Amino acid sequence: QDSCSTYKRNIKTKAIFCEKVENFFSLVDKKKIILPKFDCFAYGFPCNDFSNVGEHLGFRGKFGPLYSYGVELIDRYHPKWFIAENVGGISSSNEGKAFKKILFDLKHAGKGYNLTVHKYKFEEYGIPQARHRIIIVGIKKELNLKFKVPKPNYKMMTAKEALSNIPFDAYDNELTKN
């Protein structure tokens, strides 16, 4: 709910579906909602059950299986490409079996996708935080394209450095009202 409220406040669009992901397809089918054609689908499924910080439950947890709703969306709507994101710990959850299953399902969704999987260390890309994330880029096989992982720039940056030189008139630089 908080994410939807933030999105509505910052992105002025009526195309916001603010329901539990588990209800998405039943509501789309029931209300005969037709989604506009889209080329890209970006999603991050809950990391709670895959994180090394948590209990590492993977598919045995409440949130682990939620990735499958993204797979179903890809199956139904066949975007040209997709990007999925999760924590680095996903690769070892359930002794690595969960990650293999997720990759298998994403690869075979729709008419099939070529996957590029990479663990990004964002501090190596000039982001002032040590967040390590697995990013999966899938491109329709029929397009005969492959995503190329960008090389790190290794320019480490502090939060102060990142925030201190933003021009006052920069796009989206207005102060928020919370």
Name each model feature, range by range.
Residues 1-23:
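SAM cofactor-binding core of SAM-dependent methyltransferases
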Residues 19, 42-43, 84:
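Redox-cofactor binding/interface segments in oxidoreductases and associated redox assembly factors
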Residues 27-38, 47-178:
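Class I S-adenosyl-L-methionine
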